Amino acid sequence: MLRVDTSSFFLIVLSAAVAAITVAVLPKRIAPPVVVLELLLGIVIGPHGFSLASTDEFSLFFSNLGLGMLFYFAGYEINFDRIRGAPVRLGGRGWLMSIGIAYGLGGVLALLGVIDSFVYTGSAMATTAIGTLIPILRDTGEMKTRFGTYLLGAGAVGEFGPILLVTLFLSTGHPLREAVILVFFVAIAVTIALLSMGVVWRELPMIERTLEASDQLAVRVTVVLIFGLVGLAGHLHLDILLGGFVAGMITRAALRGQEISVFDSKLTAVGFGFFIPFFFIYSGMNFDLEALGSAGAMAKLAMFFGLFLVVRGAPALLLYRHVLPSPQRAALAFYCATELPLVVAITTLAVEAGQMKTSTAAGLVGAAMLSTLVFPFVARGLLEGAGDAAHA
């Protein structure tokens, strides 16, 4: 029987509310991204903080649903008609450069005995948390800008590429079997997408009418799609991130470029209002502060924090020099180097496979959390400074 710790559950919900209230009352220039506060509050209330709340299977269940919703919005916000051409082409080149740099640096660290596996460590460093960045970009109004288009292109490849790496090569030792399972999953997803596109295109006026009704047909069907594909991915032993991401892409394809603001706002309320904060707070609660107790572990955290910027930021500075001005390129570098969900997923797999020490995993996850705390702040400051200079 599933044990439910109601007090811990309430504290997680309370922490989500406190984070939102704090961001709302602080002046905009100093207000941190809400996901940052959610991570910090998770650390504070968790077993490695003040032990006010404990982790259990019930909270883990909601955290996984939140992770699925987070990647749903990543897939939904990435309009491939918008990013095709230069944005996705440059994003692909940048990620391939990042993989090369990450594996090269990982190989050196493995030879020096600092890490065990350059593949797992390198793969973790070559990610971009576009799902984490989307709420930040929404709040700052960057989603619809030219800069936002290039960032979405870089982030889409920086998120989806590592998901495929995790699915095919890192989660098991049988890439051929995983490829067959992935093809099966994609076939199901494509079938759902084609059916959805036909139904939505034919019944769009009726669907729009139900958005203001109590039955909330569109929202309910979308939630079924998200959790259904997340559950299917988990059942097939694929990463649940893939299920959420594909669900978002299917929804975007079904709408065929239609922007339905009421639908967007209702899904945003469901996702960012409840499920997604669970993932960030639960991630904070699971962060092992004790594993960073040694000087060596802290040195790894600082090293990985800097390497994230080298691996993901340096290609952005190099490749976008003809399409973005210097302040925006610098901001893009910091945004691209922001990492978290996939770092958590990859380090978990690596530790379970015996390919990574817990101190290395803690250093990577700690650096990823620190990147989420710091890099968006720096990027936002660079963009605001460029905007002020342009209007001076």
Regions found by a protein language model. Name each.
Residues 2-15, 36, 55-72, 115-130, ...:
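Structural signature of hydrophobic alpha-helical transmembrane segments
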Residues 99-105, 124-150, 156-165, 311-318, ...:
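Short helical (or helix-break) motifs at transmembrane helix termini and adjacent helical loops
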Residues 50, 102-108, 159-173, 225-238, ...:
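Hydrophobic alpha-helical transmembrane segments in multi-pass integral membrane proteins
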Residues 9-14, 60-66, 90-91, 152-155, ...:
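Structural signal for the N-terminal portions of transmembrane helices
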Residues 26-30, 44-90, 204-217, 222-302:
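Membrane-interface junctions of multi-pass transporters
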Residues 53, 57, 84-95, 112-125, ...:
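The feature identifies polytopic integral membrane transport proteins across all domains of life
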